[in-house]
Structure formats: C-alpha cells, structure tokens
Amino acid sequence: MIDHAHLRLFQFCDSQFPTGAFSHSFGLETYIQRDIVHDEQSFQQWLILFLNEQLTYADGLTMRLVYNALEQDDAQAILRLDRILFVQNLPKETRQGSKQMGNRMVKLASELYDSDWLDWYHAQMLDKKAILHPAICFTMLGHHLEVDIETIIDYYLYQNVSSLTQNAVRAIPLGQTAGQRIVHQMIPS
C-alpha cells in the first residue's frame, strides 16, 4: 500500500519544486572556479564531504532536535535552533540561499497544508524572530504529515544531494547519466 503522507513530503524533494534549490550551489561554484571540482570523481568527493561534514551534523542533527521540540511544543528551542543554523553558515551567499529557500518552502507548504507550526514559523520571520531555514521548514512539514523523523531526514538529505548534483551537471558540466550515477552511489546500501 502506498503511504500518501510520505509521497506528500517527497513532493518537496522534486527538483522542479520551486524552492530555489536549483540556483544555490552552497560553495560548489567556488570549488569549480578553483578547478578543485572538475569532473565526476572530484564532484562526488566534494559531495560526500558536504553531506558528511555539513548536512548530516548541522541540518540533520537540527532536524532531529526540532522534531523533538515540536513533540514537546517548545517554540523557544525551535527559534534558538533557527538562529544557530543561520549563523553557522559563514559565507553570506550560503546564508542568503538558505534564507530564500526556507522562505519559499514555508510559503509553499503553508499554501498546501494547514499547519499551525508552519504558520507560526512564518509569523516569527515576519516579526524578525526567525530566519526560516529549509531544514526546519521540512521538519515541520514532515511532522505535520506524521512522517517519522528518520524518513524526514533521509528525504531532506536526498533532496540536497539531488539538487546539488543537478547543479553540478550544469556547472562542471557532467552528463545526466553521470549525475544519476552519483545520486545512486550516494544512497546507502
């Protein structure tokens, strides 16, 4: 039987979903310009490092903490995590990219779903108390859809791997087959 809640969350992983992920490289562009990333192998090495050093321990860990805060109705913990995620991204481009993606994601999610937490998070941004990080938005949406946290994190990481790979396919350039090979190899056995 198909789990429709999972499909609804997975919709936000689609590279055609208009969050702006396709236009943010999160540092990849710099590595390409410096010829550190220039082919399939060097991109995959960069992607593994980004996934293991940045996404897993910053976004992934925060997602688990946000999920727990949602379960405990701890709004202050969510605001604290929002600020931490924003300031730990040192490059201005990365901070702005995350902010734009989070803003777009929460607006789209709020249009599609009636979630008190997403509405609250958006209101906090309007009151200048929150930035709207995509990892937090995605977690709130998954929580609203009653998807377990492990799946929420897996989908979020997949979405990032897929988007960054599509960016690399265009920027390096890599072929579409090479891009799909990389995405396939990034999925744990």
UniProtKB/Swiss-Prot annotation:
Gene3D superfamilies: Urease accessory protein UreF
Keyword Chaperone: yes
Principal localisation: cytoplasm
One CC-aspect GO term: cytoplasm
Keyword presence, RNA-binding: no
GO molecular function: nickel cation binding
Cellular localisation: Cytoplasm
Family as reported in the entry's similarity comment: Belongs to the UreF family.
Functional note: Required for maturation of urease via the functional incorporation of the urease nickel metallocenter.
PANTHER family documented for this protein: UREASE ACCESSORY PROTEIN F
Assembly information from the UniProt record: UreD, UreF and UreG form a complex that acts as a GTP-hydrolysis-dependent molecular chaperone, activating the urease apoprotein by helping to assemble the nickel containing metallocenter of UreC. The UreE protein probably delivers the nickel.
Protein name (Swiss-Prot/TrEMBL): Urease accessory protein UreF
Naturally occurring in which organism (per UniProt): Staphylococcus xylosus
Name of the gene this protein is made from: ureF
